[in-house]
A protein has these predicted regions:
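Mid/C-terminal beta-alpha module of Rossmann-like enzyme folds, strongest
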Residues: 86-182, 196, 201, 217-225
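Conserved beta-loop-beta element that borders a ligand/cofactor-binding pocket
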Residues: 8-39, 100
Length: 227
């Protein structure tokens, strides 16, 4: 997001002060939140894929919820742990580095090599014992709606909650934005890869798609949000 007015205000407020700031720019954040979040794609997909497996069984094929254009677009994921560790690195630089870092903007993501949904979707689905497939030619090449599927099968999700003793309030809550998965996975139809050269000059860490997404799903499972 581009908060230009906020950045201008921070520059004005920090001028001549002992404190400074750093502008951190991730792409889609891959992580865990305990109490719902309007932009938490891992939670939306975890609910969808858990329920999909419950209804269709292990080994079922899951069509990508987007289109052929978004399926092949280049992008970078930004896992919450990498973002956090970068922020720690940026805010604990030595005194001689501080002037070089203060007020700077940094793209922050998991890998300098961009990926695609065609590479990520099968990995994400495999966590749930499912097979991720490319967009279908049916329905104009547009894939299914994850949050719509969960809403339509709400009673079956409630069965899962009861059977596995899960936390409630994840389906139909007022904090999660149902259109976010479609926005990210269907409407983003252009390459948007990030240049991480500047980030890696200050702090270098790379995380695979599997490690980033599986860690988020593990945390949802440990919190009893998914079975």
């Amino acid at each position: 997001m581009f908060y230009y007015n906020q950045l201008d205000l921070l520059k004005q407020m920090s001028k001549g002060k002992s404190w400074s700031f750093v502008d951190v720019i991730p792409d889609v954040i891959i992580g865990f939140v305990p109490n719902n979040n309007i932009y938490c794609l891992p939670q939306a997909l975890a609910l969808y894929l858990c329920l999909y497996r419950h209804i269709n069984g292990e080994g079922a094929k899951v069509v990508f919820p987007g289109n052929m254009k978004s399926w092949s677009n280049l992008c970078n994921d930004s896992s919450q742990d990498v973002i956090a560790r970068f922020c720690l690195a940026a805010t604990t630089v030595s005194a001689d580095q501080k002037s070089k870092v203060a007020g700077q903007s940094y793209n922050v993501a998991d890998s300098a090599e961009p990926s695609t949904w065609s590479a990520k979707w099968p990995i994400i689905c495999s966590y749930f014992g499912l097979i991720g497939t490319e967009p279908s030619e049916a329905n104009g090449g547009k894939g299914p709606d994850p949050t719509g599927f969960v809403s339509e099968n709400r009673e079956k999700w409630l069965e899962l909650e009861k059977t596995h003793g899960l936390q409630t309030g994840r389906v139909g809550n007022e904090r999660s934005y149902g259109g976010f998965p479609a926005f990210i996975m269907d409407m983003f139809q252009q390459d948007r890869q990030l240049d991480l050269t500047k980030m890696h000059d200050l702090y270098h860490e790379e995380v695979s798609t599997k490690d980033a997404w599986f860690k988020a799903f593990d945390r949802f499972r440990a919190a009893k949000i998914i079975p």
